[in-house]
Amino acid sequence: MNPKIKQMLIRLAAENTGVRGRFKLAAGIVYKGHLIATGVNSYKSHPLMWEWGKNQHSIYLHAEIDAIKNALRLITQNQLSKCDIYIVRIKHPDNGSTGWVEGLAKPCSGCMRAITSFGLKRVFWTEDNMLLLNEQFT
């Protein structure tokens, strides 16, 4: 995972005002080493989630689907199949601290179906409880 792109996505997740809660996610589509589109999780529903949600109750927009949707405004589906997707999750630690740690951002089954269907080359995600040094994201 490219550390610069990862840090951009972590900042995007932290700044996401569309969700309130213990965790936030952001995803990025990377084409030829460049971040070309991003997406964040949202409480807003979206028609794409009816197709790619993991079940019929999973209607809220996932970061991966949002990033794919935004990428398809810029590139063709054929070009998308040459892209990577990066997914980051940040969460508050279990100890009640106000900082952020990385969380497991492995795509759900619905998002993984979308990633596979659109032919994305590689998938990168953050792992659980990796301390984000002392950086404060507000």
Indicate where each model-derived feature is located.
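Functionally constrained cores in energy, signaling, and assembly domains
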Residues: 6, 21-23, 28, 69, ...
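Zn2+-dependent cytidine deaminase-like catalytic core
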Residues: 38-138
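Short, basic/aromatic recognition patches
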Residues: 1-24
